[in-house]
Amino acid sequence: MRAIRVRTGPGAFQYQIVEGLTPGVARNKLKAMFRDFVTAIKGTGGLILIKTTPGNAAGVASLIDRMNEPKVLGTVAGDDTILVVVDGEDQRADVQREFQNLL
């Protein structure tokens, strides 16, 4: 079972199941999580580094994967850092801009 931590109010969080999410629903959840947890986005080459608040990288990365974005090959998440591998350096700026627009 896959679960992610989501904000339910000021200082309040709960875990929600992410199995079976459509890309549209995943995008809405991802936007909320970016606003709540992402602190920085930087890119170089075909890689994007996303910094989150501690303990939230895995949940954000899981939703990025569920977006089924063809330009994104995959993600690797630690505690507060996500590495997004993009399909080619030329695609990175587009994907990074999409992530910035979620903030």
Feature locations, PLM:
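N-terminal helix-turn-helix
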Residues: 1-5
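Minor-groove-contacting beta-hairpin "wing" of winged helix-turn-helix DNA-binding domains
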Residues: 11-18
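Non-DNA-binding regulatory cores of transcription-related proteins
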Residues: 23-96, 100-102
